[in-house]
């Protein structure tokens, strides 16, 4: 009985360690809250940011067009 309890505790501890490691990776994963959009006269697809007046920093956006009250931001 003691060996089974010890083995159960070891498995439980290992599961906690692996779950915590996955959470650390998830914190640093890139995540955008944008939908695809298209602007006339611009090739490709942009990112539609809802209820924003400007494009957010840190994503490499270089141009945009307004689709009131939203903005469509282009990375190239």
Swiss-Prot record:
Residues 20-33 form a propeptide. One of its GO terms (molecular function) is toxin activity. Disulfide bonds join 37-72, 39-65, 55-73. It is found in: Secreted; Nematocyst. The keyword Calcium does not apply. It comes from the Eukaryota. This is Kappa-actitoxin-Avd4o. It comes from Anemonia viridis (Snakelocks anemone).
């Amino acid at each position: 009985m003691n060996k089974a309890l010890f083995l159960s505790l070891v498995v439980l501890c290992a599961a906690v360690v692996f779950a915590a490691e996955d959470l650390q990776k998830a914190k640093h994963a890139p995540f955008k809250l944008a939908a695809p959009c298209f602007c006339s006269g611009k090739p490709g697809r942009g990112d539609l940011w809802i209820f924003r007046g400007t494009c957010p920093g840190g994503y490499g956006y270089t141009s945009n067009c307004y689709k009131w009250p939203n903005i469509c931001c282009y990375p190239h």
